Amino acid sequence: MFLYDARKGGVRGIRHKAGQSLIKFKNAGFTYGGRYILSEMNLHLQAGSFHFLTGPSGSGKTTFLNLCYQALMPTTGTVQIFEQDVRVMTRDDIAKMRRRIGVVHQNCQFLDHLSVRDNLMLPLVVSGRKDEIDQSSLDDLLSWVGLTDRGNALPPELSGGERQRAALARAVIMSPDLILADEPTGNVDWEMGQRLMALLVELNKMGKTILVATHDLNLIRKVKSELSARTLRISNTKLQLPGANL
């Protein structure tokens, strides 16, 4: 399988020890236009965990995820990613860190003139690692997300659900340790949302760490019936732990 490394006898991309904190927030905050969007955030995101991030629209869920891979810098406090303080990371540190994190956006973007297959390969091509996955492994990846017959299609030809599955495939092709998903089921129907969430659950069972921002409480309940997942909630700029009882 594309995520299994036969040479090492394990899942590709697992570079951490069980229980290690991959993301640490210590009194972290973020301001925009002089106003706090997030404040006094404290969190240890442990390796192998599955977390949901909830909160009203505009509460700062996307901002929180952006802080988790240094797309934004904290205004106050500290954020550590893979035990490195984001404030002192070099460009090389940032590049290495981002190779270990897969991101799935609600409105995923692709290069429309390239096939799905070529779009999936872009992260590896850009990072000089295209030889790390062969065509058979790429076929396995397409099959895993249910896009076996869509590899040669162009992005505009895909349905909303197919685009989201392609986005997930692109996020995991680098074999990341941590996967951040921002409303991955927001633009799809209930059935497709369940399929996407089932893939994230499968990744978690492989040892991947998952953080999903969502407002879909029914999907949260379904996942919680299958595995031990925690729910975090942002309210009035603060992060509530361990989260609301849903």
Listing of model-derived features with the role each one plays in the protein:
Residues A153-P156, M174, M206:
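Conserved signature/switch motifs of ABC ATPase nucleotide-binding domains
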Residues L114-L122:
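Short coil-to-helix segment of the ABC ATPase nucleotide-binding domain corresponding to the Q-loop/switch region
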Residues L168:
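Hydrophobic anchor residue at the start of the ABC signature
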Residues L154-L158, E162-Q164:
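Conserved ABC ATPase signature
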Residues Y69:
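Helix-to-loop junction immediately C-terminal to a conserved catalytic motif
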Residues G77-D85, M97:
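Conserved ABC transporter NBD signature motif
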Residues I179-D182:
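Catalytic Walker B motif of ABC-type/P-loop ATPase nucleotide-binding domains
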